[in-house]
Amino acid sequence: MNRLLWTPKQDSIQNSRMTDFQNFVEKTIGKKFKNYSELHSWSVHDLNQFWGTLWDYAPVIHSQKYEEVFRSGARFRDAKFFPGAKLNFAENLLRKKDESLALFYRGESGAEAQLTYSELYKRVGALAAYLISEGVGPGDRVAGLMPNVPDTVLGMLATTSIGAIWTSCSPDFGAKGVLDRFGQIRPKILISTDRYEFKGKSLPLSGIVTEIAAQLPDLKKILIGEYPSIESKSLEKRMESFPKNSIPLEESYKPFWGKEPSFFQTTFDHPVYIMYSSGTTGLPKCMVQGSGVFLNHWKELALHSDLREGDGIFYYTTCGWMMWNWLVSSLSIGATVHLFDGNPFHPSPEVLFKYAADRKIKIFGVGAKYILTLEKDKYKPSSDLSSIGAVLSTGSPLPGYGFEYVYDSWGKGLRLSSISGGTDLNGCFALGNPNLPVHASELQSLGLGMAVEIFDDSGKPIHEQKGELVCTKPFPSMPLEFWNDSDGKKYEGAYFDTFPNIWRHGDFAEILSNGGMVVYGRSDATLNPGGVRIGTADLYSLLETISEIGDSVVIGQEWKDDVRVVLFLKMSPESNLTPELEARIRKDIKEKVSPRHVPAKIVQVADIPYTRNMKKVEIAVKKTVQGEPVTNKDALINPEALEYYKNLPQLSVD
């Protein structure tokens, strides 16, 4: 059993939204549950009752009732949720129209902006009317090349309110990275800003907008918002450098001021979002998702995160990561969504903590990499974090010492919930739970309605053992389809090639006896020396504690009819990989992780490659080492780092 770090108080359990939902289930359908395990078991064994009860509890705003909750199909992906229902995604997010705060923004420079629910509602109505005037309708695509500012939320809500499809990329993707995505889905409207800021620099966007617009044949108009700034405003002057079919965003909808959102009524499986895979193995896959995303987000935010109307919620994310979509769904609960754009360590590591303290944020979300960076520096926030009830961590596994750092340095009274899922489902398979204790390294519980199991290589369920994370039953937020995949081969190949009709997610994980989960890394990055599969998370966890090591990546190199473990190290400033240090690293790995994890080779490199969402790319490193092409380096934030892994003489000998 991993170390116990937090236990919920009895009164907080009684008052949690999870308990309230459980009481609602007992009252409406007569089911009684002794614990969360029983509640979860019911939720996955009776999909009709669970999702139907959640629909009523939320409740989902709709104009036409569904014919049935769940209709199974011949294949996993053929299943339908809520056929016959009519609703609108944006209408379910814009439930409130009052003067309470919907959005609060702060940039790294200190610039701030805010919108009440009333103001947001009015702007959505006006922008939606403009989009309709430009011929945008149901099924058309509106793309955002956007920083994380209020106008991005406005663009998404206006788009989905008329039945069109929203898709977005972060400006740091670069022209090729953006075209690899938007070029496939061919938007009618592009929304961007005049510039954005990062690490104290003002970065204009006219160049990249001009370059990508020239290669989007269906593009009719480009709307340019003004990036929030503490400087004097100068959008009019900056507009001169954008393409001729560009107009200021605010000017586009001014003539339509006073128009209310029409909220075009769609089926439950009408497309809402197009999301993208990382694209590290080729062109990004374009995953089309519907209103099931909203219902799943609502469940995760309200029940698993205990978010309530009026609460402040924050997640450090860009608009190119699914956590942006997840965060913005908090509007459906009536919370205040806190946005931040810029570098989270500029001008100091205190910037996000000060934001949380100033705004009395209740739910504070970051990537595991952020926590581990601060842990390595033994950073102790000086801001008052007493308002934070829950810290959420995702993006990669958070090791036990990362948990302990948060409790030692941020506060002992908060609930630290590691959450794990993916862009594919726009949500989580395992995540937090206000009614359960927190143990180091563990995700507290499996998600309600998610039939998650662990399979061995032969496709048999295993318990308290490491294996493949799978989902055995459909869920509402699964992709409706992949764009440009008429025969469904890309979709089938992405999830169902390994185990027929079973969703294989690609994580190497273990479900524990207490119902929690530990994720050991991506299953395609697991090491396989001597035919025994071992995860990478435990190894990374140890290496993070060695002060001489700045960063690391480990791969399994195919060698002499077997696989050998190769460890690459980026050293801390003023440190080098000496024979003595190498011997100590091997000894520590053998004693503290396992003898199987001990590398055959340890190689010092100048840099470690990452995706733009700060995930290590073991597969790209492995391909480079083995002389195989890496097809889409633009998916990486530092593609030049792969050069350090080519033709290494140490890896051509025993």
Spell out what each predicted region is.
Residues 161-251, 360, 367-368:
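Structural core segment of the AMP-binding/adenylate-forming
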Residues 147, 189-208, 229, 318, ...:
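Adenylate-forming
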Residues 144, 169-195, 209, 345, ...:
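AMP-binding/adenylate-forming catalytic core of the ANL superfamily
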